[in-house]
């Protein structure tokens, strides 16, 4: 059931509170004053620029959608929306560069505490602190919904709110490898169900031997520089990733296990599992499981899988049930696409963080109040929500007689996708069930729910200031070694790992670990564990 804003705050009290909140937010001059009637003055037209992740679309569909959407935004809040894309090529670097560039044109920022450096960028001053009065006034529906779930506490740093969680949207974002069940069955794997890493070896080799026109896994190593090392560790150890404290681009720090999550470790330094993983990658490299120049390749593995020219792709569960399986059923009939998720052997799967998707307001925004008003509409207004997420009805999507989402005849995701990538405010109350999603979606989610554990690090904020130099030095070491290990480019991976460990020690590994453990101990105490 949709939630509605309760009683209106008295106009005089709200106006006074807003004056104080704006001073607290750095004294920015507001173009959105609140009148005696309690309404916001939106007489000045403003352009709101939202930073999103993904390759900028070129098919014209997003532009057409924005034209329709901006008509509504102009009518409701006298604003229009513009999208700025951080494209997938070198996105980890470019995203942070964009945020810290001082660009005054940016307003709404797509962020996350696990994969988009939300805490780091908060600490570096990239985001504007958001007072509760500000949120109540300019994003009232969002404020009420998040408050009803008591989730603002996950968005606070030094007792101030810095972003808005996408906390009312159901998804599983645990990663794994997508593969063809028909080929897996032909390779001798029972029912074509890969249930352990070793069976990937069987599958890849069969594809290599029997499908000469196919690259078993045409990995885009330039973008996925860690390859399957992290997945192997997830499946072959009890370690659990500690989100938001990556070293460079890599999920380096982990908890010992779900039963001992508050003891910090790193399998890259303290376990033999990385030796085993790198030996398998060496074998796969020698066998030609990926292309020789994999580390320089940045092609679209997913489209290759849809075209039948590669036998695997890597991403998360939601991608599987919303895109991979339905597209493979249509484009590679009988392929029986399946997913081997990391941690299948040992049920090492956590539920997503509530801040896996979130929205922040840029610290350099020239009109943060109007940005919040636009965001509130995108997240809660049905017409705006459908446009930003689905496009134009009758062109990008249609509603079936039973109220489900479908696409017009001839629509092809590869060519006609909207790609607005609004991943920071999706809302289960306004989601429309997609008829093209895999029919087994509910069963897959229900299965995860039987064993997936709550992520123990929701709300963990790590202060890296005292070890920033050491973390940077460690990042340089990992950038040198991890891609080469991940794609089997070292003739003697054990020697390379030992050398990497020596360099990480010299870079300050022990100091960083000690600092992180102190943060973890404080966090454990704060949540009463």
Language-model features, listed with the residues they occupy:
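Extracytoplasmic/secretory soluble proteins
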Residues: 3-14, 18-529
């Amino acid at each position: 059931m949709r939630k509605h804003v309760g009683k209106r705050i008295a106009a005089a009290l709200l106006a006074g509170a807003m004056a104080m909140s704006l001073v607290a937010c750095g004294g920015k001059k507001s173009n959105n004053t609140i009148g005696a009637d309690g309404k916001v003055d939106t007489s000045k037209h403003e352009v709101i620029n939202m930073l999103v992740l993904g390759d900028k679309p070129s098919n014209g569909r997003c532009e057409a959608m924005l034209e329709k959407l901006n008509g509504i935004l102009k009518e409701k809040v006298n604003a229009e929306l513009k999208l700025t894309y951080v494209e997938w090529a070198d996105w980890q670097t470019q995203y942070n560069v964009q945020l810290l560039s001082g660009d005054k044109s940016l307003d709404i920022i797509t962020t996350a505490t696990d994969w988009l450096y939300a805490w780091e960028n908060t600490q570096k001053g990239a985001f504007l602190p958001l007072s509760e009065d500000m949120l109540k006034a300019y994003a009232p529906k969002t404020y009420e919904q998040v408050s009803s779930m008591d989730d603002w506490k996950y968005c606070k740093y030094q007792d101030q709110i810095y972003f808005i969680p996408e906390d009312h949207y159901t998804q599983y974002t645990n990663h794994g490898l997508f593969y063809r069940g028909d080929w897996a069955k032909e390779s001798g794997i029972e029912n074509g169900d890969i249930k352990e890493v070793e069976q990937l070896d069987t599958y890849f080799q069969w594809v290599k031997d029997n499908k000469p026109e196919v690259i078993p896994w045409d990995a885009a190593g330039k973008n996925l520089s860690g390859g399957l090392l992290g997945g192997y560790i997830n499946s072959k150890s009890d370690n659990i990733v500690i989100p938001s404290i990556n070293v460079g681009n890599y999920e380096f720090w982990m908890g010992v296990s779900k039963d001992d999550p508050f003891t910090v470790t790193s399998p890259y330094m303290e376990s033999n599992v990385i030796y085993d993983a790198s030996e398998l990658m060496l074998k796969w490299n020698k066998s030609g499981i990926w292309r020789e120049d994999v580390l320089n390749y940045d092609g679209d593995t997913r489209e290759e899988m849809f075209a039948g020219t590669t036998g695997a792709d890597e991403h998360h569960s939601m991608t599987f049930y919303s895109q991979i399986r339905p597209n493979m059923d249509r484009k590679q009939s009988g392929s029986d696409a399946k997913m081997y998720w990391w941690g299948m052997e040992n049920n090492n799967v956590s539920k997503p963080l509530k801040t896996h998707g979130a929205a922040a307001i840029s610290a350099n925004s020239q009109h943060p109040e109007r940005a919040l008003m636009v965001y509130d509409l995108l997240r809660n207004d049905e017409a705006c929500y459908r446009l930003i997420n689905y496009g134009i009805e009758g062109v990008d999507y249609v509603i079936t007689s039973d109220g489900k989402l479908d696409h017009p005849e001839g629509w092809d995701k590869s060519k006609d996708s909207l790609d607005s990538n609004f991943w920071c405010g999706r809302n289960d109350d306004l989601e429309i069930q997609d008829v093209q999603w895999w029919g087994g979606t509910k069963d897959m989610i229900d299965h995860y729910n039987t064993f997936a554990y709550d992520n123990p690090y929701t709300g963990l904020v790590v202060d890296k200031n005292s070890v920033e130099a050491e973390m940077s030095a460690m990042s340089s070491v990992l950038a040198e070694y991890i891609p080469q290990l991940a794609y089997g480019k070292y003739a003697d991976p054990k020697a390379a790992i030992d050398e990497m460990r020596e360099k990480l020690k010299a870079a300050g590994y022990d100091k960083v670990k000690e600092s992180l453990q102190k943060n973890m101990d404080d966090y454990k105490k704060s949540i009463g564990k």
